[in-house]
Amino acid sequence: MEILGERMLLRPLNLSDSERLVSLINASVNELREFMPWMRENVTRKEEDEYLLRAVQEMNLNQAFHFAMVLKESKEVIGVIATHPIDWLNESVSIGYWIATAFSGKGYTTESVVLLLEGLFMELKLHRVAVSTTTDNVASNRIIEKIGFRFEGVQKLAGKVAPSRWKDLNTFALLDTEYKSMRKNLFEKFLGGKYPKVKLA
């Protein structure tokens, strides 16, 4: 599945993304490691290849989706947005994302989340999408809130960010009915009024 928006393209990750992702991660590690325990100095090509192999396998088995966040005009990969394993029985999933520091604050992540929601709700017909973020991750909380996710509560010390170090998590969710009621407004607000184009594999 590929999803095209106003400025962003979400496309499945593949092994050829490894070198670019290693470069982005290592350039952004100081800003992002507070919120992501796996993100540390000197992420290696081998480690990234292993992640990408797992991601491709999960996508092939329809277990989860891992997308490169790509600038539509320049074709640059600037981050990753993905689902955790999908609960097909209950038609629900949680999502996560990161963007390289050099590209943050420009609305790219917000657009990418909206594009992913379109794919999950309108194409995969899921019922519920959730996201958790540390309570001190101001940028991520702001993105989720302005899109319209519903705040469900705080999970006490549920996010491990370093060995023997945990943080509280804010938990948000959105139902299919809620998304459909705000869908047009989201496109006007974050996609210049254009509807996303979803291409199924």
Where are each of the predicted segments found?
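Conserved GNAT-fold acetyl-CoA-binding loop/helix
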Residues: 33-53
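A short helix-loop-beta-strand connector motif used in the catalytic cores of GNAT acetyltransferases and
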Residues: 53-68
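Residue-level detector of secondary-structure transition/capping positions
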Residues: 26-29, 40, 56
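Acyl-donor (CoA/ACP) binding surface of acyl/acetyltransferases
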Residues: 1-20, 24-31, 66, 70-201
